[in-house]
Structure formats: structure tokens, C-alpha cells
A protein has these predicted regions:
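C-terminal regions of RecA-like/P-loop NTPase motor modules
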Residues: 2-14, 46, 128-131, 169-170, ...
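Hydrophobic positions on the alpha1 helix immediately C-terminal to the Walker A/P-loop
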Residues: 53, 57
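Anion (oxyanion) recognition and catalysis
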Residues: 62, 164, 168, 293
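Pre-Walker A (Motif I) flank of P-loop NTPase domains
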Residues: 36-40, 77
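Conserved inter-motif catalytic segment of the P-loop NTP-binding fold
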Residues: 6-10, 18, 24-25, 29-30, ...
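Phosphate-binding/switch region of NTP-binding enzymes
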Residues: 41, 47, 52, 82, ...
Length: 326
């Protein structure tokens, strides 16, 4: 018996009883897309508006404004934003100013003398020093380190584990922006560059793409949501004259977005339907929705069409009436 006990002592393993683990609710920076204390990946093809989208979100977070209409306001937060592609003075700063950001709350780790990588101690030091609630690395390919093969799971896994622990320790959201590969026929989970361990470590994966039938319209669509019901896609416009504009919910899946099979024709059908039924004046919302269902128009598509047309909704005698804009 003594021999067995001695053997057990020599091979002692530190164990944690689940009985000692407190139950905590997931906290969110932007529900249901960006959880706090976790890794989120935002990916898309070059030129699809990933950086512009993130800077718009940063502007709202640093000023405490709702990110989009209907999102709850919050206290202004500090952000760490690292870019390996764009100039700070001629690109990032002007975009932040245009978006209305509080630039005093946006910090950049000075890596002029030494390139920043995922296993760099300066990353944790900066989070601790600033109390940042959001850390952005844009793009992730620029921060894995020259000696790391991003296609090898055994090299990527410890890096992702480390930053996941950083996010958990400091309760901040770490957002990794990445380009996608050119395998257009693959599922969304296999279109991110490098090892699948990137996406495996993330609790939320978002994809940005453009709508084929509308060159100014982009959509951010959830590809993975481990901590909340998968939210619907949200659209935004990058207009040469008006700049960035949120365009509301959009009825499309991530695989449809990546394959280019836009639902633009269904949206146009829904728009034509609304124009026809409302041509003679306002009608009750319930009546319109029932007629749309009979016509095979999905609720999300009807909602998108209503938003695009600017259909108004007015409550009269305990019912909502829809009407075309004057």
C-alpha cells in the first residue's frame, strides 16, 4: 500500500473539481457577434470592407454610442488596434475621425523596432496598462511570426491558446481579422487562411462579403456562434458619397454569401409585392404579413424589402399600418 501511495504522490496531478467552479453568464461587447473574454474572427476577401466595418464599430465603442440602431448603448471603452497593412496617419486615423471615434481611447502598440507577434509579452502588458475591452489584430496573418507555419496545427494551436487565455484573464474581446482563401467551392469553415485551429479556437466567426446585385452593399454574416443563438446577417453600405451606412438585417446565409448566390431577386420580388399591395393606401401589418406568407415571401425578406423601400409603420386604433413613403 505504501508503495502505491508513494507512486501516486510522485505522479500527482493538479485537478480542479467542477464543484468549485462558479457559474458565470457570458458577457458581450456586441451581442450576438463579439463576446467578451473570447476570440472572435472576422474574415472576408480583400476589399470587402472588413477594416472599415471594424473601425466603425470602434468609433461607437469608444464614444459609448449604439453600434447600430437597436443595439444598447454602453460606457465608452478603450481599444487596442494593430494594423500590419495600413498607415496610421494617412488611412486609419482619417477613417476613425470620419467615423466619429474618440481617438484618445484608441491605442496602438509601437512595434517599429520589433514586430509584434501573438506570443509577444507586450500584448498582455498593453491590455493590462490600458484596460482595453477590445483588441484588434488586422490582419492575423501579420502577427503569427516569421517562424510559424500558419497551416500547421501544432504551431498555431499554442498561439491561439495563449491569446484565448489572455482574453479570458482580462475579460476583453480579441478580434482577429483575416483574409480568405480562393477555394470558392468550399464551406465557410474551410475558406479561412491557414490551419482550421484558427476557427476552432474562436467562439465567434464572422464573414464579410458583398452582394452580387448591389456593388455598394456588404453583409456581415455569422459562420460560427458557440455562445449564443446564431444571429442573422446585418448589411451595411460603402457609398462613395455618403460613406458607411448600416442597412439593417439581411436574409442570406454565409455559404450563399460566399458562393455569390445572392438573394437579390427575392428581395426585388418582395419589393414589388409591397408596392402592389400598398398602391391604394395603408394596410394593417398583420394582413400584409399573411399575404406575403401565402406568396412564399419569407419574413426576413419582407422586412428587408420594407426597409429598402422606406415603408412607414404607424399605430392607429391598436393596430400597425404600413404605408409607402410619400
Amino acid at each position: 500500500m505504501k508503495k502505491k501511495v508513494g507512486l501516486m504522490q510522485r505522479n500527482h496531478v493538479k485537478l480542479i473539481s467542477m464543484d468549485t467552479i462558479p457559474i458565470e453568464a457570458v458577457k458581450w461587447l456586441l451581442y450576438p457577434f463579439i463576446p467578451l473574454g473570447k476570440i472572435t474572427i472576422l474574415q472576408g476577401d480583400p476589399g470587402e470592407g472588413k477594416t472599415t466595418l471594424v473601425l466603425q464599430i470602434i468609433a461607437a465603442l469608444t464614444t459609448g454610442k449604439p453600434v447600430w440602431e437597436g443595439a444598447p448603448p454602453m460606457e465608452p471603452v478603450n481599444v487596442i488596434y494593430q494594423t500590419a497593412e495600413d498607415g496610421l496617419s494617412d488611412t486609419i486615423k482619417p477613417r476613425l475621425v470620419a467615423a466619429g471615434a474618440d481617438c484618445a481611447r484608441v491605442m496602438v502598440i509601437d512595434d517599429f523596432d520589433r514586430v509584434l507577434t501573438l506570443d509577444d509579452d507586450r500584448l498582455e502588458q498593453a491590455i493590462e496598462q490600458t484596460g482595453a475591452r477590445l483588441v484588434v489584430l488586422d490582419p492575423i496573418q501579420g502577427y503569427i511570426g516569421a517562424s510559424v507555419d500558419m497551416h500547421r496545427a501544432n504551431e498555431i494551436r499554442p498561439l491561439m491558446y495563449r491569446i484565448a487565455k489572455l482574453a479570458e484573464k482580462y475579460g476583453c474581446a480579441i478580434l482577429l481579422i483575416g483574409h480568405m482563401n480562393k477555394n470558392s467551392g468550399e464551406k465557410s469553415s474551410y475558406r479561412g487562411l491557414g490551419s482550421i485551429d484558427f476557427q476552432a479556437a474562436a467562439r465567434s466567426v464572422l464573414v464579410v462579403g458583398r452582394i452580387k446585385d448591389d456593388p455598394t452593399l456588404r453583409v456581415v454574416c455569422p459562420a460560427k456562434s458557440s455562445l449564443a443563438p446564431e444571429g442573422g446577417a446585418v448589411a451595411f453600405r460603402l457609398d462613395p458619397e455618403k460613406g458607411f451606412q448600416w442597412a439593417g438585417p439581411y436574409d442570406i446565409s454565409v455559404d450563399e454569401l460566399l458562393s455569390g448566390s445572392s438573394r437579390g431577386h427575392k428581395l426585388r420580388e418582395a419589393q414589388s409585392f409591397l408596392k402592389e399591395v400598398l398602391a391604394d393606401g395603408p394596410l394593417p401589418q398583420t394582413e400584409i404579413e399573411a399575404a406575403a406568407q401565402q406568396a412564399g415571401i419569407r419574413p426576413k425578406t419582407l422586412r428587408n424589402a420594407r426597409y429598402e423601400l422606406g415603408v412607414t409603420s404607424t399605430k392607429i386604433s391598436k393596430q400597425w399600418l404600413w404605408a409607402l413613403p410619400e
